[in-house]
């Protein structure tokens, strides 16, 4: 079982259970009542945000939805995979509320397409840069707790840096990301060099949207990530793509196909106005020298 497979298994199981419920023309409340659980609990099961699905609940749902023996066996197989604890659960004590779901999606994704207008994305941050940002959010953390938060962020980066089947990362950073001082000139110099080095990886495409490009979409665009999960042997998507957006007060997951396409179109417009990868590296290395 791969470190990221448990999240996909939970998502697939949730989808099949939702399809089964809708096929029986049952509401969440009606199906939940039949298994003596709350509607919110069943909704979390269908949305794959329950870390451990009880066998008794799965057995009851399979019977209610009239799944045959093969279908039920497949559901139980997915449940076993989904119940396996992934690496990030050891960081549960320092994991922001509900962020484990995003980390699971990120660890499962085959391709991540992201735009950041203000900060270096977590997957490309150096430990020092991450430490400054995390300290700002959690100023009361003790040394050990703070170190674990930084460790969690850096651990996520192995999805991009590992040798075996690393995910593809497409990133556009607005020039303001390079100009905004985080932690002082030494931290910024190291971060600029790290970005330049990461951009040489075959699975990473990093581009800078210069100030001179203005606002290609006519409006200011907030940060977003498009997560895609690859295809099976028949060329069918293993899981539908998801867009994740984050704001000061919370986050949002978007899955409607037309919405996903709008974000792809937005990214393409930004990409067409961004610098070429080779020019990006030259700029990043020049800025590293300036900060140093």
Segments from the language model and where they lie:
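Short secondary-structure junction/hinge motifs that connect adjacent elements
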Residues: 33-35, 93-95, 282-286
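Short, charged recognition helix plus adjacent turn
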Residues: 73-107, 235
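Short acidic/polar alpha-helix capping motifs at helix-coil junctions
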Residues: 5-6, 22-26, 39, 97, ...
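Short alpha-helix boundary/capping motifs
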Residues: 2-3, 49-50, 59-61, 70, ...
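Hydrophobic protein-protein interaction segments
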Residues: 111-292
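Basic, Lys/Arg-rich alpha-helical nucleic-acid-recognition elements, primarily the DNA-binding modules
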Residues: 1-80, 85
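Short, functionally important structural connectors and interaction interfaces within domains
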Residues: 37, 45, 97, 104-107, ...
């Amino acid at each position: 079982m791969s470190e990221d497979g448990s999240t996909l298994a939970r998502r697939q199981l949730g989808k099949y259970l939702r399809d089964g419920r809708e096929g029986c023309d049952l509401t969440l409340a009606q199906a939940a009542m039949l298994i003596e659980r709350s509607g919110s609990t069943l909704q979390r099961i269908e949305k794959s945000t329950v870390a451990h699905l009880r066998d008794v609940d799965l057995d009851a749902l399979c019977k209610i939805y009239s799944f045959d023996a093969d279908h039920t066996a497949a559901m139980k197989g997915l449940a076993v995979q989904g119940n396996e604890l992934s690496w990030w659960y050891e960081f549960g004590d320092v994991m922001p509320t509900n962020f484990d779901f995003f980390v699971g999606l990120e660890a499962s994704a085959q391709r991540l397409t992201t735009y950041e207008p203000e900060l270096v994305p977590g997957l490309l941050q150096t430990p020092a840069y991450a430490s400054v940002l995390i300290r700002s959010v959690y100023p009361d953390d003790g040394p050990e707790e703070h170190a674990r938060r930084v460790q969690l962020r850096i651990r996520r980066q192995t999805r991009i840096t590992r040798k075996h089947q690393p995910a593809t990362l497409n990133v556009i950073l607005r020039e303001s990301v390079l100009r905004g001082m985080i932690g002082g000139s030494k931290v910024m110099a190291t971060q600029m060099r790290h970005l330049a080095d990461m951009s040489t990886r075959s699975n990473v495409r990093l581009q800078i949207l210069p100030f001179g490009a203005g606002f290609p979409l006519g409006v200011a665009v907030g940060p977003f990530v498009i997560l895609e999960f690859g295809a099976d042997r028949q060329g069918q998507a293993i899981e539908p793509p998801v867009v994740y957006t984050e704001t000061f007060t919370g986050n949002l997951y978007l899955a409607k196909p037309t919405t996903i396409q709008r974000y792809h179109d937005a990214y393409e417009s930004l990409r067409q106005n961004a610098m070429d990868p080779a020019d990006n590296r030259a700029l990043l290395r020049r800025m590293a020298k300036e900060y140093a």
